[in-house]
């Protein structure tokens, strides 16, 4: 089966069987197309049925040089779904993506206020009425909870 036919069948499956949005389908197609483009650029003539995990690992290594871990994870997820589909439709016997792990995605810690900034906020509260005491209570509770 040619790549173009496999991709079209996969898109049809995603739309009809899985009911995914057009945007999601476009992203999956884009991910698989990146692999196909890599194979074409490197003059590697292999079908979707015959590609092995080593070629895919080479592709992912090249991707890792220019893409962040979140993008790499999305591409891996798209390829995993594509090859799951090929196995489901009996175009392939196995999914070469099964043993390929997604990169860890680091989380950015939130920016926090300094003690000086908190003190300035508290000092700015007008304590001449009940709303000021309410606001002070809310700010102190948020601060003490680490929010």
Locate each region found by the language model:
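Conserved catalytic core of the tyrosine transesterase superfamily
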Residues: 1-147
């Amino acid at each position: 089966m040619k790549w173009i036919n496999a991709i079209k069948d996969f898109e049809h499956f995603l739309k009809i069987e899985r009911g995914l949005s057009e945007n999601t389908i476009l992203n999956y197609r884009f991910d698989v197309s990146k692999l196909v483009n890599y194979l074409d650029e490197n003059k590697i003539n292999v079908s979707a049925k015959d590609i092995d995990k080593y070629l895919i690992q080479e592709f992912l290594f090249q991707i890792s040089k220019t893409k962040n871990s979140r993008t790499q994870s999305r591409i891996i997820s798209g390829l995993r779904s594509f090859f799951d589909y090929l196995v489901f439709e009996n175009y392939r016997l196995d999914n070469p993506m099964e043993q390929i792990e997604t990169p860890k995605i680091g989380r950015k810690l939130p920016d926090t206020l300094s003690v000086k900034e908190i003190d300035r906020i508290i000092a700015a509260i007008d304590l001449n009425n009940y709303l000021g005491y309410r606001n002070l209570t809310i700010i102190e509770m948020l601060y003490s909870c680490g929010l």
